[in-house]
Design a protein with these regions (language model features):
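Short, flexible/disordered intra-domain loops and linkers
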Residues: 2-11, 76-83, 190-194
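Conserved catalytic core of nucleotide-sugar-dependent glycosyltransferases
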Residues: 98, 105, 116-189
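Residue-level recognition of the N-termini of beta-strands and the immediately preceding loop/turn
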Residues: 34-38, 62, 104, 135-139
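The conserved acidic donor/metal-binding loop of glycosyltransferases
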Residues: 111-114
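Short, acidic, metal-binding catalytic loop of nucleotide-sugar glycosyltransferases
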Residues: 4-34
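Active-site-proximal specificity loops/subdomain of glycosyltransferases
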Residues: 46-103
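Short beta-strand/loop segment that forms part of the nucleotide-sugar
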Residues: 30-45, 66-69
Length: 196
């Protein structure tokens, strides 16, 4: 896949993880009692790249687990490319980790996004505010996708903590939700990973 800056994939992943760590640290200054656990699903990284990530996360509450492709061979339909299968397996593994290990809010993050330092604090505060106002859990996406403005769909603007949020009816794979919604819609999450 052609990238804007044409650097090796590790450069995007490293910068993404580093910006996420900074955002987590900022969030902890605002919510010192908030328990944040991060799990990285590694899909056969080269040893030198994995070592670089391990140095970055050393001493932080971050685990790395290796993706087991064989676990998903019977679940995921045969795909045109190994990369597509790997992406679906990684996504399924991430959803399973969220389902099995989370307690409250879950934030699924792709490895090529850069995060503003106050991003996580804004999401947690806005989630709490909006979910309280709506009296229900929700899905929250920190990314703004310009292609979502191309059609003329009805939308709502919600006031968050320090930013406004727009309702959408689709997202990619970076979003926050509750464990309750993950469980409630588990079949949908599974179906998302079975085939592309």
């Amino acid at each position: 896949k052609k990238r804007l800056f044409e650097l090796p994939k590790i450069e995007y992943s490293y910068r993404s993880i580093n910006s996420l760590i900074k955002s987590i640290n900022f969030c902890k200054t605002k919510y010192p009692n908030l328990q944040i656990k991060t799990v990285i699903v590694d899909d056969n990284s080269k040893d030198k790249n994995l070592d670089r990530i391990k140095k970055l996360i050393d001493g932080k509450n971050i685990d790395i687990i290796s993706l087991n492709h064989n676990k998903y061979k019977d679940l995921i339909k045969e795909q045109k490319t190994k990369e597509t299968f790997s992406n679906l397996a990684s996504l399924m593994n991430s959803f399973e980790i969220g389902k099995d290990q989370s307690e409250d809010l879950i934030f699924f993050v792709e490895d090529d996004y850069l995060h503003f330092e106050p991003m996580l604090e804004e999401m947690v505060a806005s989630y709490e505010r909006i979910a309280s106002q709506l009296k229900k859990d929700l899905f929250m996406c920190p990314s703004d996708y310009p292609y979502l403005y191309m059609n003329n769909e009805k939308t709502n603007i919600l006031i968050g903590n320090k930013r406004h949020w727009r309702t959408i009816n689709k997202t990619l794979c970076t979003f926050m939700t509750s464990k309750d919604l993950l469980n409630k819609y588990w079949e949908n999450f599974e179906k998302t990973c079975i085939d592309r």
